[in-house]
From Swiss-Prot:
PROSITE patterns: INTERFERON_A_B_D. The gene is IFNT10. Disulfide bonds join 24-122, 52-162. InterPro entries: 4_helix_cytokine-like_core, Interferon_alpha/beta/delta. Keywords: Antiviral defense, Cytokine, Disulfide bond, Glycoprotein, Hormone, Pregnancy, Secreted, Signal. IFN-tau genes are intronless. They evolved from IFN-omega genes in the ruminantia suborder and have continued to duplicate independently in different lineages of the ruminantia. They code for proteins very similar in sequence but with different biological potency and pattern of expression. CDD domains: IFab. The keyword Disulfide bond applies. One of its GO terms (cellular component) is extracellular space. This is Interferon tau-10. Glycans are attached at residue 101. SUPFAM superfamilies: 4-helical cytokines. Residues 1-23 form the signal peptide.
Length: 195
């Protein structure tokens, strides 16, 4: 597990870069919060990974969309924002409170909320008047379906400890992928297909 955490931390550290390419300032704090959120998710581990193998599931993380080169700036920004919002919604529930260490869960929710607030400063400049249109675009719908699948899985499994552990691991994967998108947003201006 220490190797996995080290690998995740290395991925996040590589994603540090100067902000400001979006016509607004994506603060360094956004990346620091991302790293801290991954660390908190790792610390929330309560069960041996081997004890929940029967509950593993492929939730269909739209990884090629998050890590690939197919999104323009506004789309990428919206996907990142939606992933963080849905992650916050997932962990900011009564059922989630019953499953996790309250202190760690509150810290995670605070970190996710901080990332959302940092991104809110860029919503206007990036999205402009297109806000309502972008909410209906395919990448956002894909992210919403992905998270709906996670909610459905938890309900189907009765919000069991193993179900939550499976979701915790999946959220580490999703948030790690979202750091790739954050990195691209801080390094490019306008067209995410640029080198």
């Amino acid at each position: 597990m220490a190797f996995v955490l080290s690998l995740l931390m290395a991925l996040v550290l590589v994603s540090y870069g100067p902000g400001g390419s979006l016509g607004c300032y994506l603060s360094q704090r956004l990346m620091l919060d991302a790293r801290e959120n991954l660390r908190l998710l790792d610390r929330m581990n309560r069960l041996s990974p081997h004890s929940c193998l029967q509950d593993r599931k492929d939730f269909g993380l739209p990884q090629e969309m998050v890590e690939g080169d197919q999104l323009q700036e506004a789309q990428a920004f919206c996907v990142l924002y939606e992933m963080l919002q849905q992650s916050f919604n997932l962990f900011h529930t009564e059922r989630s409170s019953a499953a996790w260490n309250t202190t760690l869960l509150e810290q995670l929710c605070t970190g996710l909320q901080q990332q959302l607030e940092d991104l809110d400063t860029c919503r206007g400049p990036v999205m402009g008047e297109k806000d309502s249109e972008l909410g209906k675009m395919d990448p956002i719908v894909t992210v919403k379906k992905y998270f709906q699948g996670i909610h459905d899985y938890l309900q189907e499994k009765g919000y069991s400890d193993c179900a939550w552990e499976t979701v915790r691991v999946e959220m580490m994967r999703a948030l790690t992928s979202s750091t790739t998108l954050q990195k691209r947003l801080t390094k490019t201006g306008g067209d995410l297909n640029s080198p």
